[in-house]
Each structure stands twice: as structure tokens, then as C-alpha cells.
Design a protein with these regions (language model features):
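Non-catalytic DNA-recognition/assembly elements of restriction-modification systems
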Residues: 1-60, 181-191
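Sequence-specific dsDNA recognition surfaces
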Residues: 40-57, 72-101
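Flexible loop/N-cap segments at domain edges
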Residues: 69
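A short beta-sheet element
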Residues: 95-97, 101-152
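A short glycine-rich beta-alpha junction/loop motif
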Residues: 128-137, 166-191
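Polar helix-capping/helix-linker motif
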Residues: 152, 156-160
């Protein structure tokens, strides 16, 4: 079993960022002039505490800052959004934002005594480092292109789980170690 896991990790490491970039070029996904992907978005880390109203971002000038949403604001979920990118006025708008502007979601374990997944959103910028907490249990693409890329290049099996009604794309089970071996640049904002 350990040998199989090692092979899987090696396979994913070899198929990481370069493979996703090559796939993007062949499918017409947006690619920067220097040939790099503009960003890959993750949902990562521990949940924020629920609040009755949204709180302002830490720093409006900082792309890494975010706003908090209460669990009532987004169908029982708790999210953190990068600042300056969305005026959250309705659940529909929130869902559209997640589905359209982020390529990948990573989902936390359910919290004790709660029926909801609790997640937060990260926008990855080139050259930053990805840190994946141990409580991450799944990775989920939020666009068809990334879904196909993950399936084709990482050979992941779909568990068919979904995070509420945000997007019908499958959830792919993957270990923390395997996610880290992807070596995709980025940074967790909810430390």
C-alpha cells in the first residue's frame, strides 16, 4: 500500500503544473503572454467563525485580504473572499463568482456537530507558496477545463460528492501529501 502511495505521489509530482499548463494551451483556457496560467484558485484551511454580518477586508489594497461571510449569507457555508473583487448581495451572485472565477476548490472536513462543509477561498498569485492543512479532504474543480485536466493528468477518481449547490462538478479525493506534491505556486490566506 505504501509503495502504491509513493508511486501516486511521484506520478502527480511529474504531472503537476507543467501538465496543467499544457492542457490549458490545448483547450483555449486563458494563458498569460509569458505562457503561464493567470491563477489557480483553491478553497483551503480552517473555517472562520460565523458572524451576523460581513466584516470589512483587512486591507482593501491587498489582494490577499478578504471579507467574512456569516453561515446565513451563503446557504449554511462559511467563506472568505478576496477583497475588491465582489460586492456580495445575493447567494446567486456568490455561487456564480465561485463557479466562474476559481479553477479548483479544496474542501475541509465537516466540523463536529455540523452538517455543513466549512471552507474558505484563496486566490493564488504566481510565485507564492501553497500550504495545505491536514484537515483538507478533497479537491474540486469549479470549471470543466480544470475538471478534465485533473482527471486526465492526475488520474483521480470522482467521489461524486458536492459542496451544497455551488457547482455540479465532481469532488476528487486526494491526500494532503499528493496535493503538496503538485508544486502549484500559491499561498494560504486564512492562517
Amino acid at each position: 500500500m505504501e509503495e502504491e502511495n509513493k508511486k501516486m505521489d511521484m506520478k502527480i509530482e511529474a504531472k503537476g503544473t507543467e501538465a496543467l499548463l499544457e492542457y490549458a494551451k490545448t483547450t483555449g483556457m486563458q494563458v498569460n503572454e509569458d505562457g503561464s496560467l493567470p491563477f489557480i484558485g483553491f478553497v483551503v484551511g480552517k473555517p472562520f467563525k460565523g458572524k451576523s454580518t460581513m466584516t470589512p477586508p483587512r486591507n482593501k489594497e491587498d489582494e490577499g485580504s478578504y471579507v467574512h461571510l456569516s453561515s446565513q449569507d451563503v446557504t449554511g457555508e462559511e467563506f472568505a473572499y478576496p477583497s475588491g473583487e465582489l460586492d456580495v448581495r445575493s447567494n446567486r451572485e456568490v455561487k456564480h463568482y465561485i463557479a466562474q472565477d476559481y479553477d479548483v476548490l479544496i474542501t475541509n472536513r465537516k466540523t463536529k456537530g455540523s452538517a455543513d462543509y466549512r471552507v474558505s477561498i484563496l486566490r493564488i498569485k504566481p510565485g507564492q507558496k501553497v500550504v495545505i492543512p491536514d484537515n483538507v479532504i478533497a479537491i474540486r474543480p469549479t470549471c470543466p477545463e480544470m475538471s478534465t485536466a485533473l482527471r486526465d493528468y492526475l488520474n483521480l477518481e470522482s467521489t461524486r460528492e458536492q459542496v451544497r449547490n455551488l457547482n455540479p462538478s465532481p469532488v476528487y479525493s486526494i491526500t494532503t501529501k499528493a496535493i503538496q506534491s503538485l508544486k502549484i505556486p500559491g499561498e494560504v490566506i486564512d492562517k
